Amino acid sequence: MKMLKFTIEQIVWQEVPGEVSLAFLFSGCPLRCKGCHSADAWKEGIGTELTEDYLRGRLKRYRGLISCVLFMGGEWQPETLQKMLGIVTQAGLKACLYTGLEREELEAVSDGILPYLTYLKTGRWQMELGGLDSPTTNQKFIDLRTGEVLNRLFIKDKPAPKIIPITTQPQAAAFQTA
């Protein structure tokens, strides 16, 4: 079984709406989307190995503080990713995968992981379409329990800027002379 290596590990609040997630960004993504914000992680084999013991230790450390584990990539190592997802679900946490693949492509590459996932983000990054916070995006964020696409949770109403008129009025003279 091949190993997964991560270049970033962090607690995130925005990537999975309504969840506090422990996120791992894996190296070695073969998709290489133009404009990718994680291009520095494309090189295979860089980073720290995510072992079963390491993951269990992190889940223990953050018990009660996180509700989800987010894997950014890793679907190119389906057996290893499935094992990690099993650890997450056994710990009673939700699991999310961010992939640039479409769902049909993911099923063809690593069909065994879908039953372990609570959430799935699909779609290659296309700069001209924007990310999940864009109404024109090609990407989808799906709650796999219900099949509902949750993109609306990423799009913030952007109110018109509040304009406060500034007027300069001459101040009354404090002292009047006679």
Report each predicted region and the residues it spans.
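Conserved, mostly hydrophobic/aromatic
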Residues: 24, 33, 120
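Conserved glycine-rich "GG(E/T)P / GGGxP" loop and the immediately following alpha-helix
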Residues: 65-88, 137, 145
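N-terminal [4Fe-4S]-dependent radical SAM core
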Residues: 1-25, 30, 38-44, 175-178
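Short, basic/glycine-rich phosphate-binding loops at helix/coil junctions
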Residues: 33-41, 63-66
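Canonical radical SAM enzyme core domain
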Residues: 43-57, 76-114
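Structural recognition of alpha->loop->beta junctions
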Residues: 56-63, 107-129
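Classical nucleotidyltransferase
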Residues: 117-178
